[in-house]
Curated annotation (Swiss-Prot):
Residues 29-316 are annotated as: Disordered. It comes from Mycolicibacterium vanbaalenii (strain DSM 7251 / JCM 13017 / BCRC 16820 / KCTC 9966 / NRRL B-24157 / PYR-1). Belongs to the TRAFAC class translation factor GTPase superfamily. Classic translation factor GTPase family. IF-2 subfamily. Residues 305-314 have a biased composition (Basic residues). Residues 575-577 are annotated as: G5. One of its GO terms (molecular function) is GTPase activity. Residues 435-442 are annotated as: G1. One of the essential components for the initiation of protein synthesis. Protects formylmethionyl-tRNA from spontaneous hydrolysis and promotes its binding to the 30S ribosomal subunits. Also involved in the hydrolysis of GTP during the formation of the 70S ribosomal complex. Residues 121-135 have a biased composition (Low complexity). This is Translation initiation factor IF-2. Residues 539-542 are annotated as: G4. The keyword GTP-binding applies. InterPro entries: EF-G-like_DII, IF2_II, IF2_N, P-loop_NTPase, Small_GTP-bd, T_Tr_GTP-bd_dom, TF_IF2_bacterial-like, TIF_IF2.
Amino acid sequence: MAGKARVHELAKELGVTSKEVLARLSEQGEFVKSASSTVEAPVARRLRESYGGSKSDKTKAAPSGNGAAGATVKPSAPQSRPGPKPGPPVAQQPAAPAAPPAAPPAPPTPAAAPPSPAPAAPAAATPAEPAAPSARPGPTPGPRPGPSAPKPGAPKPAARTPRVGNNPFSSQQPVERPAPRPQGPGGPRPGPGAGGPRPGGGPRPGASPGSMPPRPQGARPGGGPRPGGGPRPGGGPRPTPGGAGRPGGGGGGGGNYRGGGAGGGAPAAGGGGFRGRPGGGGGGGRPGQRGGAAGAFGRPGGAPKRGRKSKRAKRAEYENMQAPVVGGVRLPHGNGETIRLARGASLSDFAEKINANPASLVQALFNLGEMVTATQSVGDETLELLGGEMNYVVQVVSPEDEDRELLESFDLTYGEDEGGEEDLEIRPPVVTVMGHVDHGKTRLLDTIRNATVREGEAGGITQHIGAYQVTVDLDGTERPITFIDTPGHEAFTAMRARGAKATDIAILVVAADDGVMPQTVEAINHAQAADVPIVVAVNKIDKEGADPAKIRGQLTEYGLVPEEYGGDAMFVDISAKQGTNIEALLEAVILTADASLDLRANPDMEAQGVAIEAHLDRGRGPVATVLIQRGTLRVGDSVVAGDAYGRVRRMVDEHGEDVEEALPSRPVQVIGFTSVPGAGDNFLVVDEDRIARQIADRRSARKRNALAARTRKRISLEDLDSALKETSQLNLILKGDNSGTVEALEEALLGIQVDDEVELRVIDRGVGGVTETNVNLASASDAIIIGFNVRAEGKATELANREGVEIRYYSIIYQAIDEIESALKGMLKPVYEEKELGRAEIRAIFRSSKVGNIAGCLVQSGIMRRNAKARLLRDNVVVAENLTISSLKREKDDVTEVRDGYECGLTLTYSDIKEGDVIETYELVEKART
């Protein structure tokens, strides 16, 4: 039995109980727990050897196809070999071919039984008796004249199972050899009836001239005669290098020690060639084939078959050799093809595109000093750099292209009118009012729609977008115009940019008494970038110091040339407070729209537009202010806006009245979203809620990946020590009344530049009041909650007081920015500035056994102060730094300080002083960080 065996299997094989086997193993020094335990092959061999092998043969009634102790011979083999078997005289008893025993264990026979020369016609499957020591004293020196002729009268069996070779530990079964060996067993083989010296297949001399080198002498597992006819379970010493009269195993194949041996007591199945390896028991000697049995420890029993490599294998090997090595890792080599990746893609996504192993990309970046996991979002530069090293062109897909591809996967399009020219109808113009803060934009809209919106704004500053549609009576014709009011404060850049993209015409409001300001220039840039025509409204002409001509001259520098100066920009002087020239301004807007714009849309398609603003209402839930750009929005439609989706449950106009449908250029408030959409997100109507949910989920995942790639800190191995140092960090949780305000506040706060030592991090943001969940998060992360135009809800205030969480409320954005900036500056580590105190020259040195060297000094300037910091100068060269004046005396009295012009004695925390040295004292003063 080659390989491991269980105790109960051995007990069944040996015909004893498992307890007896366990006891016998314990006597042999082997610790085995139970009958289900396995023992190694050497242990099983020693166990069988201790039982003498007889019980094994009695228990095996038929040969086993997967026996572990040795290979058995098929019962049909003796019938095909009727010829007499040469060999020394032995007392051999033929056994029935129906029950051949297994090899190598042999049945117990009398030890003194000599070998018989009787013919062994049925003995091919009969185990050979062990030869006495006197019967085979050494190798038979018969000649080996090369290949021998086939044995007359003894045809080879058509198929036989050769025994396992010289390896007692082999777990593989021998392979059948139907074809005869081309090389005979060596030596003269007489015909039938002739005696020979090989009971197990003929003599095996140790060497044959011209066929093989001499076989080394020594122990050989599985070979050699056994003195006294004792059983030979699997191996033992083999003093003679020649033939093997193995009980139950047959002699080794003639020729040399690499030849295959025959089965139990029969002549070898083929001549021994030099092709098999040791352990190829029944293998043939033909070139290019393995031995019939396995080698030691499961290795193949012969030399592997070597074939010619295919062209594909050679090409793959060549390409692998030519593959680029990045960071010591061999990576695939591209042909310059373009790989499209989404923003925030991971190395797994990149590896999937190029059929590479993600682990190799991770290892390559790690060796280059970049620590990234396979599923972590990677920045665009890292992907492009890695792709360039492998000869790939990495193209990071823009968010717009990625969103378009996402919609195309659902057979949806955005931004195009369906149908032909006959389906398009005239729509009202969308006008955005832009300008610097406090220049009168909201007052102008109030005058147009006869409302008072400005008084409701905190500080008189518009902090969210307002969208209104008013009907203007122009020359007896009612013309609807949609107005969008944008903030003018510098923190609302993104909101102004959204207003410019969603508009048809921009009204630029400039105060005649203030002139062109930074946000005025920014509004001009946004409008020009969106290719939107601009109508300039010069406001506050009724105030003292107003100079409309000056405004025209200033705006000329930015490409806005008035029509009276030969340009194409329309300028209207107005007074929003007095209502002067408002109709002229509206007329200019209508004329500009009719003259230079094609304002048409298809109202019969599914609605599409943009979410101008969104907020969380306590009673109504998420509310989004949307502007319909094409199509008609109806109650009950399934909509998706950004990563929010839902079904339109209710629509409200600017007057608070319910509407059932909204046509193009109509702003309405939509109620029914499952979450708050982002300000500026595109919205569209889809057929089913399922499609809307899938689109929203994919957009949300894309946004998370992009955010992770943008906010992930690039930590290299060189910067790891500094990155692990403690840095001051201010965590914030932002809550506001609408999403646009929260977005603007976050951008303004993150734009505060204080120092690299402190970091501002917004860990959460949302629309609505401060909740207990926000307080718990702030408590766990040591964060401050910023509430903008909102208050704490319910028990959130009590929880915040109990947990020690600070909640700050603001209604004006620049107050929040100033206070957060001050808090960041207060978190800076202090910077100390050196302030000189005085200088003293050493005139004499006194030595003391208690305190060491005492310096007798004359204070030249300033003061000498006890415990002050000092440095020692010698010839204007600093000798020692960071010293301390440990003691200071004037005459014999201890003093705290000595002024200039006086002598003193002092000791330093430094003993190597000389006369003429100068002691300079200083103190460190904390400097305010800015």
